[in-house]
């Protein structure tokens, strides 16, 4: 079979298109807010990572516009060469203070952070240890490092210790999601930090979904547990609570200096553009000044979770405003997603191999700016469609 033959044989997406159940690359015609314009009508958005509701905030947009006026639309180079602006440095200082580390380094995307950090820190004689449900960027970054990759069962501390014990004579890096992006549960950081210390492993937390959601004023998972000093590296993204695009890693000054000079994803990629840098900086300011957003996010989480539980939905181990509704087979998830959008709710289907076969789910995520009426309206629709598809009892 020729290299391109597999392209002609790739039918999965087209088969879904043929039966009008393709739920990817959907075109939204408005800003990402609690409601969006989709296929010509306003529907409730329960599929966005805009946790604090800041992507369309006037102050964040004004900061981006001012940055374009001063610096232009791009940096025309990598951070390593001509692409570092004074606002990059200012943002890095703000991020380091936010997560309680000495120094931070900004990348153009969150995915690139994990690629760059893992491939620069670990090598062929090292071991990277990951949770089975860690984000794809962690898996790809670990592969790029050429280190041996060991997986442990999801949030299973006994299994993690078995892996660590079997690798006690090697250099080890544990990397774990602070908040797991599909399940919505939180890493068992108290136990993980103890095991990392016991077995001499470096510990990195991917806090893409933790910053803005957990900790004092949204400072993240490590802050939430009071374990910032026990975590060597904290990674985060700007495409969720911080209303933009990009990512960062924060840690000891010498470690960040090392990554600066060896992370190919940083050195050979164009710098994060001025508008994005300024919008993140403004979003951090708003997040720290307006704690009501954090409180509202968790109040909305409690309401939605109660409605789902009362209706009989299986929400798995979720502990955060990422709430999965387990529906079973992949095709059921596709059907439910389509029916919900028809009825006025935008959600995301998560199917195998992202989850195990038979455990497909509808991934629901909340914003601080959702109103009680919007949540109740969306939940009424969820219950209606769930009963139609025999996911919950009638």
Locate predicted features.
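Conserved active-site segment immediately N-terminal to the catalytic lysine
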Residues: 200, 207, 220-238, 257-261
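Active-site phosphate-binding strand-loop segment of PLP-dependent enzymes
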Residues: 150-205
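N-terminal "arm"/small-domain region of PLP-dependent enzymes with the aminotransferase-like
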Residues: 8-73, 201
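Conserved PLP-binding catalytic core of the aspartate aminotransferase-like
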Residues: 295-304, 309-343, 354, 359, ...
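PLP-dependent enzyme catalytic core of the Aspartate aminotransferase-like
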Residues: 58, 62-66, 70, 97, ...
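Conserved N-terminal alpha-helix of the aminotransferase class I/II PLP-enzyme fold
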Residues: 62, 66-109
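Conserved core segment of the aminotransferase class I/II
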Residues: 233-235, 242-291
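Conserved PLP-anchoring active-site segment centered on the Schiff-base-forming lysine
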Residues: 117-136
């Amino acid at each position: 079979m020729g290299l391109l033959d597999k392209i002609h044989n790739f039918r999965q997406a087209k088969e879904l298109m043929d039966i009008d159940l393709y739920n990817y690359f959907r075109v939204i015609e408005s800003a990402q807010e609690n409601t969006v314009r989709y296929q010509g009508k306003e529907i409730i958005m329960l599929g966005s990572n805009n946790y604090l509701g800041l992507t369309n905030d006037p102050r964040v947009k004004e900061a981006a516009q001012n940055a374009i006026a001063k610096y232009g639309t791009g940096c025309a180079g990598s951070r390593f060469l001509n692409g570092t602006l004074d606002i990059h440095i200012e943002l890095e200082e703000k991020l380091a203070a936010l997560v309680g580390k000495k120094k931070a380094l900004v990348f153009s995307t969150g995915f690139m952070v994990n690629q760059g950090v893992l491939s620069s820190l670990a090598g062929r004689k090292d071991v990277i240890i990951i949770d089975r449900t860690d984000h794809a960027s962690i898996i790809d970054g670990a592969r790029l490092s050429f280190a041996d990759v060991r997986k442990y069962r999801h949030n299973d501390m006994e299994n993690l210790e078995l892996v660590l014990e079997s690798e006690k004579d090697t250099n080890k890096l544990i990397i774990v999601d602070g908040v797991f992006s599909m399940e919505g549960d939180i890493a068992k950081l108290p136990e993980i930090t103890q095991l990392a210390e016991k077995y001499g492993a470096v510990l990195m937390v991917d806090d893409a979904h933790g910053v803005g959601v957990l900790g004092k004023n949204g400072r993240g998972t490590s802050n939430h547990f009071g374990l910032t000093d026990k975590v060597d590296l904290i990674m985060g993204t700007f495409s969720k609570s911080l209303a933009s695009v990009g990512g960062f890693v924060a840690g000891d000054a010498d470690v960040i200096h090392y990554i600066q000079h060896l992370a190919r994803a940083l050195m050979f990629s164009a710098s994060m553009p001025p508008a994005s840098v300024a919008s993140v900086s403004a979003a951090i300011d708003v997040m720290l000044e307006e704690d009501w957003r954090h409180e509202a996010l968790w109040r909305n989480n409690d309401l939605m979770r109660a409605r789902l539980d009362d209706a009989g939905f299986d929400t798995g181990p979720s502990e955060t405003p990422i709430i999965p509704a387990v529906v079973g087979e992949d095709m059921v998830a596709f059907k439910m997603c389509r029916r919900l959008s028809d009825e006025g709710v935008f959600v995301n289907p998560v199917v195998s191999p992202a989850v195990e076969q038979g455990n497909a789910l509808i991934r629901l995520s909340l914003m601080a700016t959702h109103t009680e009426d919007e949540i109740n309206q969306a939940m009424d629709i969820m219950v209606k469609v769930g009963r139609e598809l025999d996911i919950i009892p009638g």
